[in-house]
């Protein structure tokens, strides 16, 4: 076996086990190919003889029934999921996906196309259509398809808020805000605290004139009685008598001046 020369091809080839190479090649190509390979050789079987053979029980299928094809229905848009009937009445919103629905509520004045898409149940009400034009008895359809004269009359009937705004602006300009720290401005725009004058009626004036002819000065008891009869206060009776005496004095003075001249 000991040779001084290089190892020849015949010697190397004799050391390689060609039988094992054929078995490994057959196993590799049988795993990659679609067709099962033939029975393996018994050269590798003794290595796994100590292990018992594994047997698995067949598992029940997950889905007992077979899959049925879904029914296709005409739709406008994409359906992310199927409709759930138990949520149709209790949910706050109606269908949130695009789907043609029969018996939809059309707009007033527009032809209904039998479709409505994801609207709230209270989106349309019966009395909303006549809110703006309900006073004139016309609907939106009459307003859209009517002539220009009727539209002009409708605009003329609507009151314009501009005069009210102008009047309120003038009213604000006439009453400027007063500065509480400026005494001059407060004095100029000061209001009198005197009460509004309450004139006497003809009946009250006549009765007071009669009482003045009898007595120019009233006692307290008589003043109380006159005030009670004429439905006046004692202060009103007192002031009237004071003014009447001043008027009488002035008239007497004018008479004396006229006589001297």
UniProtKB/Swiss-Prot annotation:
The keyword DNA-binding applies. One of its GO terms (cellular component) is nucleus. Its main location: nucleus. Gene3D superfamilies: Homeodomain-like. GO terms for molecular function: DNA-binding transcription factor activity, RNA polymerase II-specific; RNA polymerase II cis-regulatory region sequence-specific DNA binding. Residues 156-182 are annotated as: Disordered. One of its GO terms (biological process) is embryonic skeletal system morphogenesis. It is found in: Nucleus. Residues 193-252 bind DNA. Keywords: Developmental protein, DNA-binding, Homeobox, Nucleus, Transcription, Transcription regulation. Sequence-specific transcription factor which is part of a developmental regulatory system that provides cells with specific positional identities on the anterior-posterior axis. Belongs to the Abd-B homeobox family. This is Homeobox protein Hox-C9a.
């Amino acid at each position: 076996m000991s040779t001084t020369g290089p190892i020849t091809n015949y010697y190397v080839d004799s050391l390689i086990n060609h039988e094992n190479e054929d078995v490994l090649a057959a196993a590799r190509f049988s795993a990659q190919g679609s067709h099962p390979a033939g029975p393996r050789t018994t050269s590798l079987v003794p290595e796994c003889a100590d292990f018992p053979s594994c047997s698995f029980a067949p598992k029940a299928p997950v889905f007992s029934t077979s899959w049925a094809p879904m029914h296709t229905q005409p739709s406008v848009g994409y359906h992310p999921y199927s409709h759930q009937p138990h949520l149709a009445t209790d949910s706050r919103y109606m269908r949130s996906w695009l789907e043609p629905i029969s018996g939809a509520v059309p707009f007033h004045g527009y032809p209904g196309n039998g479709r409505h898409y994801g609207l709230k149940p209270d989106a349309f009400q019966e009395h909303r259509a006549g809110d703006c034009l309900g006073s004139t008895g016309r609907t939106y359809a009459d307003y859209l398809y009517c002539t220009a004269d009727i539209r002009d009359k409708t605009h003329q009937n609507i009151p314009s808020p501009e005069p009210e705004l102008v009047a309120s602006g003038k009213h604000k300009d006439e009453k400027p805000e007063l500065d509480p720290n400026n005494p001059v401005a407060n004095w100029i725009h000061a209001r009198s605290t005197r009460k509004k004058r309450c004139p006497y009626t003809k009946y009250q004036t006549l009765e007071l004139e009669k009482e003045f002819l009898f007595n120019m000065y009233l006692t307290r008891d008589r003043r109380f009685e006159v005030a009670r009869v004429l439905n006046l206060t004692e202060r009103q009776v007192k002031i009237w008598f004071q003014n009447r005496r001043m008027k009488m004095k002035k008239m007497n003075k004018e008479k004396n001046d006229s006589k001297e001249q």
